[in-house]
């Protein structure tokens, strides 16, 4: 029954994605004067060159980190949306470490990423403590802290790291010793991709092969039952958000060291935390599916960007796809009747099998 339920949930997700894509394609056909060009760029543009495919992989890296971070917190039934702020603050603090603390080339990025991760853990840990100590909603407090993080980060960059010779509010150049190397020729795909995949494997192991993972999932499923079972749910709630924050903060540090010459996110929050929510929902909070969901979302965005350059359709079409997907996946009534029929059919079959076994024993 459990396997069938998982299969049904996967079917719901696939159908939601398919329906949203169909709606987007129909919209393109209706609004574009050159629908053939638009559709070709959208669907196949990311595959027409190594550079474009590399763009997909580049965008996939931060989405994996924020998707993992959000997924771990969601599994504990904690709707902490602080991954955005943790990602941003991880990058801000990493800028200080990279620029102000000279180190050997191999050690420099490792230390910088670890400190960025710890920064993210502290950031997401604050709403967790507020939730446990005073019952404050982690959803509301984490949303507010994202904006606090943005303006506090801008203050730090502006007053301590701003390059006066640059034409905008950006930091000094990051030293070469702190940068992550590129791993695919003719692209900007960096070593962060390998780190991201290792993080996925680690979180899958911890989530499904350790006692902590069992406690985390049980607390998310039913916190009262978890307490009756002897689990300290307060500790689980805090630890899930600390780990999620660490992953998001490390992701911000890796994104900075892999793709940027200096810290330059001064116009607005980078948005990867919000995208991580979409990735986590698509992956059903399962770490094993996070890379696939991140790749799918990155592919859509690069395809839409190429479409906007080569045709008369703007890349905001991705917002339509994302919105429809989230609504259908989150809607409890989507395919509800089909699920009831499946449960009823399986229950009837189980009862019939049980009755046959009883008759055989009595006979």
Name each model feature, range by range:
Residues 27-31, 37, 44-101, 113, ...:
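Single transmembrane alpha-helix segments in multi-pass membrane proteins
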Residues 13-29, 63-70, 91-97, 117-122, ...:
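Hydrophobic core segments of alpha-helical transmembrane domains in multi-pass membrane transport
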Residues 138, 142-209, 262, 317, ...:
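Transmembrane helix-bundle core of multi-pass membrane transporters
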Residues 1-19, 29, 201, 221, ...:
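Cytosolic-side transmembrane-helix boundaries in multi-pass membrane proteins
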Residues 2-11, 74-82, 104-106, 110-168, ...:
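Short loop segments and helix-boundary regions at transmembrane helix junctions
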Residues 242-248, 252-254, 258-323:
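Transmembrane alpha-helical segments in multi-pass inner-membrane proteins
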Residues 25-46, 160-172:
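Interfacial/capping segments of alpha-helical transmembrane domains
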Residues 185-262, 287-288, 292:
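Helix-loop-helix "hairpin" substructures at the membrane interface of multi-pass membrane proteins
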């Amino acid at each position: 029954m459990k396997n069938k339920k998982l299969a049904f949930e996967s079917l719901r997700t696939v159908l939601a994605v398919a329906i949203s894509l169909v709606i987007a394609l129909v919209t393109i056909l209706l609004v574009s004067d050159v629908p053939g060009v638009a559709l070709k760029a959208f669907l196949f543009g990311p595959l027409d060159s190594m550079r474009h495919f590399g763009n997909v992989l580049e965008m996939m890296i931060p989405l994996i980190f924020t998707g993992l971070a959000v997924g771990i917190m969601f599994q504990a039934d904690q709707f902490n949306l602080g991954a955005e702020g943790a990602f941003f603050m991880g990058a801000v603090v990493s800028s200080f470490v990279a620029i102000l603390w000279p180190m050997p080339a191999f050690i420099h990025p490792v230390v910088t990423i670890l400190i960025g991760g710890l920064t993210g853990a502290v950031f997401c840990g604050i709403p967790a403590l507020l939730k446990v100590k005073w019952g404050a909603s982690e959803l509301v407090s984490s949303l507010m802290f994202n904006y606090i993080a943005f303006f506090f980060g801008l203050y730090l960059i502006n007053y301590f790291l701003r390059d006066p010779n640059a034409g905008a509010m950006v930091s000094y150049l990051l030293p070469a010793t702190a940068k992550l190397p590129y791993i695919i020729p003719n692209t900007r795909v960096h070593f962060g991709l390998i780190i991201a995949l290792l993080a996925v494997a680690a979180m899958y192991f911890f989530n499904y092969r350790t006692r902590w993972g069992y406690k985390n999932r049980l607390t998310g499923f039913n916190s009262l039952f978890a307490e009756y079972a002897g689990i300290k749910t307060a500790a689980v709630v805090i630890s899930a958000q600390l780990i999620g924050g660490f992953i998001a903060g490390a992701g911000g540090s890796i994104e900075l060291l892999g793709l940027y010459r200096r810290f330059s996110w001064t116009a607005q929050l980078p948005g990867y935390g919000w995208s991580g929510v979409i990735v986590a929902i698509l992956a059903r909070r399962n770490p094993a599916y996070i890379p696939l969901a991140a790749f799918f979302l990155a592919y859509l965005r690069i395809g839409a960007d190429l479409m906007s350059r080569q045709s008369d359709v703007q890349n905001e079409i991705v917002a339509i796809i994302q919105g429809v997907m989230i609504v259908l996946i989150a809607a409890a009534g989507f395919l509800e009747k089909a699920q009831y029929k499946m449960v009823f059919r399986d229950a009837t079959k189980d009862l019939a099998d049980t009755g046959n076994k009883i008759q055989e024993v009595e006979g």
